[in-house]
Amino acid sequence: MQPPNWQTISPPPLSLFVLEQGRAALELARVGPRRKLLDTAPRGDGHPVLVLPGLLAGDLSTIPLRGFLRALSYDARGWGLGVNVGPTDTLRTKLDDLLLRTREKHDQTVSLVGWSLGGIYARELARAHPDSVRCLITLGTPFRDISATHVARLVPIRPGGRSLRKAHELRAYLRTPVPVPTTSIFSKTDGIVHWQSCLEMEGPERENVEVACSHTGMGFHAETLAVVADRLAQPIGKWRYYAKRA
């Protein structure tokens, strides 16, 4: 699926936003599908995976996702930087150090999984250090238009408040493809981020994969976890487009 050519994208309908937290609670309670998935998902090779949380969330929010990946034999790690309050003057340096230290410790490339705003960070890390990144997976990340969310006013990097020229430059920069194998996971029923703002320009080693879940539930929804497990299991140099398992 190719992304739209629109310059701006509106947030999701209010009807989805109102239902968001209730849907996420139900998705978290559905333990059965996640347990079943552990029996069928491809096993990992033990390589390191950094998981970056969304806005106003921290490592606590990614425990289910990291626990799932560890059960598949990955060395899944949180970012260890507390609550994600948005970009700060020191955050980029801390993230650079985290990635490079992890790469050096394991002596192998690192996969990045970023949820929502965490996916923006992950994309910029991969852009800056492509030789240290094995693959990039984003969950409900609005890199095509950071303002296409119901929390955009909380994010300092939003285009709003800038001149039209500066806002256009920021959007154009964030949506530029990253030079590593990239999978963008999106949901058309996302109540926080408009799904069209998550669409990658498809091309070699770039893809969009649709799931059916809430934004807040992406990190523990079985369908999302299945995609993440499949993408991480690909051998280096043998990337292929996602094909849903029977």
Which role does the model predict for each range below?
Residues T40-A41, Y173-T176, C198-M201:
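Short secondary-structure boundary/capping segments
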Residues H47-L60, P64, F68-P181, I185:
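Serine-dependent carboxylesterase/thioesterase catalytic core
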Residues M1-V49, T62, G67, L72, ...:
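Flexible, membrane-associating and regulatory peripheral segments of lipid-active enzymes
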Residues Q2-Q7, P13-L26, R30, H150, ...:
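Alpha/beta hydrolase fold serine-hydrolase catalytic domain that processes acyl esters and thioesters
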Residues P179-A246:
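C-terminal catalytic-base region of ester-bond hydrolases, centering on the histidine
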